[in-house]
Amino acid sequence: MTSLNNFKKIIALLSLSVSIVLQAESPIEAQALSVDQAMQYAIRTHPLILSAEGQYRAAKSELAASRWSRFPTVGASAQESSTEVKQDVTSASMPIWMGGRINADIDLAKSNRDGALSGISEAQQSVMLETIGLFFDYFKSEKKLEIASLNVDEHQRLYEIIERRVAAATSPDVDTMLAQARLQSARSAQIQAASAKNITKASLELTVGRVIDAVLVNNSPEPLSIGLNEAVATGIQVSPRIARIESEIKGFEANIKSAKSALYPQVSLGYEKRYNDPDPSRVDQEETFVSVQFQPGAGFAVASSISAAKQRKQSARDSLEAEKRELRRQIKTAWNEYTSVSFQLEPSKMLVDATTSVIESYLRQYAVGKKSWLDVLNAQREATQARNTLVDFEVQYLTSIYRLRVLM
């Protein structure tokens, strides 16, 4: 049930765009990819999900096969001796009471099926989280390349300004050298930013299975409307990994029952008919009988099997608690990032505006001798750093809010 709820949650998340507004105002925007679309494409083609779906189909077939164990088994045999005496036998047997083994095997198959279904949701969640990270990594690299290009243009402008002043003998030659050094440094940063964009673009394209021209992101998505405790409780309730481990625990309970069935006799109803019996007095003999078999195994093998099944069940319970702790940590980490960054966005925007205006102010003061050329270049560097910091905060905010929505 938990797995089904989680599956519905994933479909709802992908079908409703809570923060993306698509507007086809230009050819580039028409080809832009939103984060919701990226997750849809990744889920549709990712081999991890296809593998999980194959495991689910196999588990369903195994469940169907285990249910047939309740029905009669029909057999036929033919033998011919060295004396050319032929004998044909047809038989049928049906279990009456197997000490609980058949029910245990069916319960095990059910738990495997439920676990495989949860495995699909788990794979989907994993792919979605991976896609979110890659999507916003690409978005960040794209924005940082824009900032790097803007920084190059601004340093080029400053270099031309100081070059004219040096040519007019109103500034020393060292200012030109300093401006040129900063310009080359900006160009190097631009090359690095372009390389980072190409790397993140290739990773995202590999995940979504298509070529990406651009991404479309709304920097002001709808904030979360629940608290931390509710987020943690919801995340645990709908977690597909927790649901899968719970199914494994049920499977180990079935293994315990199956192991205990060896302590009881197995009763079955049989029918057998012989043809061409070598004994003339038993022509076409047929008989119906009740078979009782008791095979507890060698020594204390049954007790050891039961103990092993119980230990595996306890191990799964410990894994379940460990997974709950890990999920709490993930949600709390994403929540803390979401809340802390949300308070830093506005000050960072104000810092960008302030540092940008400082550059022109310093240029005017430099012209009248109140600021040095190094002060002007440092102001430009601080403005670039402020823009990069703002992008980092924006991406961290978007990543955390989308991660929380997927985890919940």
Annotate each predicted stretch with a short phrase.
Residues 51-66, 123, 127-150, 157-160, ...:
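Amphipathic alpha-helical coiled-coil segments
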Residues 2-9, 33, 126-238, 248, ...:
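Periplasmic alpha-helical coiled-coil/stalk elements that build and connect Gram-negative outer-membrane
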Residues 11-21:
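Bacterial N-terminal signal peptides
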Residues 34, 72-123, 243-324:
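Small/polar-residue-enriched beta-strand and adjacent coil segments characteristic
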Residues 34, 41, 48, 91, ...:
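Surface positions of alpha-helical coiled-coils, especially the charged/polar e/g heptad sites
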Residues 81, 85-87, 191, 273, ...:
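Outer-membrane beta-barrel domain signature
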Residues 24-73, 96, 110, 170-173, ...:
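Bacterial Sec-pathway N-terminal export signals of envelope proteins
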Residues 73-75, 203, 214, 266-268, ...:
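Residues at or immediately flanking beta-strands
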